[in-house]
Amino acid sequence: MAQLYFYYSAMNAGKSTALLQSSYNYQERGMRTVVYTAEIDDRFGAGKVSSRIGLSSPAKLFNQNTSLFEEIRAESARQTIHCVLVDESQFLTRQQVYQLSEVVDKLDIPVLCYGLRTDFRGELFVGSQYLLAWSDKLVELKTICFCGRKASMVLRLDQDGRPYNEGEQVVIGGNERYVSVCRKHYKDALEEGSLTAIQERHRHI
């Protein structure tokens, strides 16, 4: 019986790599997969999922207006789909998460979603909120902070490397960069206004 999966993590935990490996595992057995990624994120080129270790795969794009259930139903009528995989699933709307649950429940196609749980403010993305609520299986993909603890938070740094937690939730292609850290060092960095100073102190412990 098909299920809806949500693989979630902080940034740079290998979500895209895990998605590409799952897709490959299906294809290796002669099964057909359909891969989606968010139209909003084209850092590695539009229409593909790319991992930091150099793997990539063509992908369909979704935006807030994409009717995922109708697209997948039409596609599966033409040719059997054995699995749907969604990268950057934090950018899904509530309705799209519901549509993916319909793909599972009505079309009996497994759906594997990969995404961030929280944003740089420590708040849930809408897509992640409903995936956490409605998925059959939740899997945390772990990465570590510079201190060795599990990294569960994402810091946004400005062009001068200073952490901040105000502004738009989604900024693609700006001068900002993001770093995954543990909760303690997320709070410490925001309080001090510097991640570098905290990292330097930690090196000398």
Swiss-Prot record:
It comes from the Bacteria. One of its GO terms (biological process) is thymidine metabolic process. InterPro entries: P-loop_NTPase (IPR027417), Thymidine_kinase (IPR001267), Thymidine_kinase_CS (IPR020633). GO terms for molecular function: ATP binding; thymidine kinase activity; zinc ion binding. Its EC number is 2.7.1.21. PROSITE patterns: TK_CELLULAR_TYPE (PS00603). Zn(2+) binds at residues 145, 147, 182, 185. ATP binds at residues 9-16, 87-90. It is found in: Cytoplasm. It is an enzyme of class 2 (transferase). Keywords: ATP-binding, Cytoplasm, DNA synthesis, Kinase, Metal-binding, Nucleotide-binding, Transferase, Zinc. One of its GO terms (cellular component) is cytosol. Belongs to the thymidine kinase family. This is Thymidine kinase. It comes from Salmonella typhimurium (strain LT2 / SGSC1412 / ATCC 700720).
